[in-house]
Amino acid sequence: MILTKTEESRLLDSMAMKEYGIPEMVLMENAGSSVVRLTEKYVDWDGAFTVILCGTGNNGGDGFVAARYAAGRGARVLVLLMGNEAHMSESSKQYRHVIDKMGIPVIPISRAEEGAPYIH
């Protein structure tokens, strides 16, 4: 696995979309599903309690996808959403809508410390 800096990730995403025509939602789907797939050898998702912290940028969309995949593997998932939802991209909003339909709880927070009571 290769880790990239924020600027590098943005550049790679931009290249994938502009030069190769890969839709933003496909990038989010790949990122979110990969998080769950790559952690399967460390996490038994079935019955696991999982908290996913999402922002309102496109990484938040990745997190919504990861929440969906974790729930699909039997995890009890809680999403903590930090930031102004009005700033979310349309792709992120669509994935947020999917997890809402699945009944995955999303709790808005304005500071990371506000999420502490939900982590047990």
Question: Where are these predicted regions, by residue range?
Answer:
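Positively charged, low-complexity intrinsically disordered leader regions
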Residues: 1-48
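Glycine-rich phosphate/dinucleotide-binding loop and adjoining beta-alpha-beta core of small-molecule
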Residues: 1-4, 44-53, 60-120
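Short, flexible micro-motifs
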Residues: 24, 35, 58-64
